[in-house]
Amino acid sequence: MLTEDDKQLIQHVWEKVLEHQEDFGAEALERMFIVYPSTKTYFPHFDLHHDSEQIRHHGKKVVGALGDAVKHIDNLSATLSELSNLHAYNLRVDPVNFKLLSHCFQVVLGAHLGREYTPQVQVAYDKFLAAVSAVLAEKYR
């Protein structure tokens, strides 16, 4: 459960993420493909090389969806419903992959925000991304 303090931290840090959406999203995807190579199977048509236009574009979409979740942090289910449908029914992505990408995104935040990525911010983002992952996995039940 996100506290009001968590929500404030998430929104404050998100202002910094907005300046680097494509870069942070692409880096998180690249990290996921390296650390969890099985995730590449969902992107057979992508050029998976560093800095590929396809990865940058998809990374921007991922971070854009997270931005929508930040804007509507109190209504994640409705905000992410279409995305959940897409991943569950069309793409059939194993829900564990949402957690893997969440972890990689947190690594990117920590690497780029440095001292601003405090333990409190990390806990808030961990809870937020877990909530997003849970909502994206709702349609699988």
UniProtKB/Swiss-Prot annotation:
The keyword Transmembrane helix does not apply. Pfam families: Globin. GO terms for molecular function: haptoglobin binding; heme binding; metal ion binding; organic acid binding; oxygen binding; oxygen carrier activity; peroxidase activity. Heme b binds at H87. Residues 1-141 form the Globin domain. Red blood cells. O2 binds at H58. Keywords: Heme, Iron, Metal-binding, Oxygen transport, Transport. One of its GO terms (biological process) is hydrogen peroxide catabolic process. It comes from the Eukaryota. One of its GO terms (cellular component) is blood microparticle. Gene3D superfamilies: Globins. Hemoglobin A is the major, and hemoglobin D the minor hemoglobin of this species. Belongs to the globin family. Tetramer of two alpha chains and two beta chains. Involved in oxygen transport from the lung to the various peripheral tissues. This is Hemoglobin D subunit alpha.
